[in-house]
């Protein structure tokens, strides 16, 4: 409860407001945080802000990152279910008005073979600002319930990334992904895009991501595997070493400069949660260009503040 609200309404009202906040989150929890439209948030709390991506002239924070988070959820679902659903559209999402927030995303996906479409719900939690460090807690068709608790504390985390190996010659430890396999395993490209956009969510656009080219991708697991070891492509716990070029939003070098990133993924068999952590190797954090004044005074953020405060929207 916000202390300014207690000061405004007095101690007599504080207990009542606390009960209203508890009731609000109980109602939010009924849909696991995905369907909060029409749930009135009491003053003094930190409610989920709802964004309808289908509204005319819809503005919302981090549109590129939200789409990547939606794809990360589908990646987790496909990995576990042996499917190949692709993102068609982000329909809506909810998040907190905080630097780091869980994202509750409702999306439309399509099976590229049958062409059938299905609505999914995805929850992605962020753990670090300006670095790719996330956990996919929920990834399911909309009609399926997983009994997750909204905003429950999560203890599962990914270990620190390893050093870049001196070579990848150990065939029992490493697997070099073939170019044809890159096309059929677009999650590798997804990981690369997530690393870059997580570092600089304000500047990188879909157009920037379309120019990226993976020069080499190598996969490693902790278990030695006799070559040929294509099975590493489907390992639930793995380290991915990616060399790429085509990145134009950089201070050092240009789009022809080859760069490196390491991504570690760990799947928790007990909870079903997928955690992914990645970083650029030998480069500054792109978040150094993060301008809080620009970000928190952007039209999308100002609109979110008005929603949070219960004020009517105003034209920009």
UniProtKB/Swiss-Prot annotation:
InterPro entries to which the protein is assigned, alphabetical: MS5
Highest rank taxon of the organism: Eukaryota
PANTHER family for the chain: CYSTATIN/MONELLIN SUPERFAMILY PROTEIN, MALECTIN-LIKE DOMAIN-CONTAINING PROTEIN
Family of the protein in this entry: Belongs to the UPF0725 (EMB2204) family.
UniProt-recorded name of the protein: UPF0725 protein At1g02770
């Amino acid at each position: 409860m916000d202390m300014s609200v207690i000061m405004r309404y007095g101690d007599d009202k504080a207990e009542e407001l606390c009960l209203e906040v508890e009731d609000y989150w109980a109602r939010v929890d009924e849909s696991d945080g995905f369907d909060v439209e029409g749930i009135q948030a009491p003053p003094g709390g930190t409610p989920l802000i709802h964004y309808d991506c289908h509204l005319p002239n819809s503005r919302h924070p981090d549109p590129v990152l939200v789409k990547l988070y939606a794809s990360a959820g589908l990646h987790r679902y496909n990995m576990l279910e042996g499917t190949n659903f692709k993102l068609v559209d982000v329909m809506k999402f909810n998040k907190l008005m905080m630097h780091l927030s869980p994202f509750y995303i409702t999306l439309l996906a399509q099976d590229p073979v049958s062409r059938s479409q299905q609505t999914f719900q995805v929850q992605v939690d962020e753990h670090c600002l300006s670095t790719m460090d996330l956990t996919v807690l929920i990834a399911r068709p909309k009609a399926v319930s997983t009994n997750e608790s909204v905003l429950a504390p999560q203890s599962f985390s990914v270990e620190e990334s390893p050093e870049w190996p001196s070579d990848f010659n150990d065939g029992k430890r490493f697997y070099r992904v073939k170019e044809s396999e890159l096309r059929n395993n677009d999650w590798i490209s997804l990981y690369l895009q997530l690393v870059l956009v997580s570092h600089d969510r304000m500047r990188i656009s879909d157009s920037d991501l379309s120019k990226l080219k993976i020069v080499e991708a190598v996969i490693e697991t902790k278990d030695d595997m006799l070559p040929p070891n294509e099975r590493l492509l489907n390992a639930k716990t793995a380290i991915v070493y990616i060399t790429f070029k085509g990145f134009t939003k950089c201070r050092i070098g240009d789009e022809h400069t080859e760069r490196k990133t390491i991504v570690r993924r760990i799947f928790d068999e007990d909870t079903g949660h997928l955690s992914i952590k990645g970083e650029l190797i030998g480069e500054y954090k792109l978040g150094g260009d993060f301008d809080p004044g620009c970000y928190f005074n952007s039209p999308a953020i100002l609109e979110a503040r008005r929603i949070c405060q219960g004020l009517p929207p105003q034209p920009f």
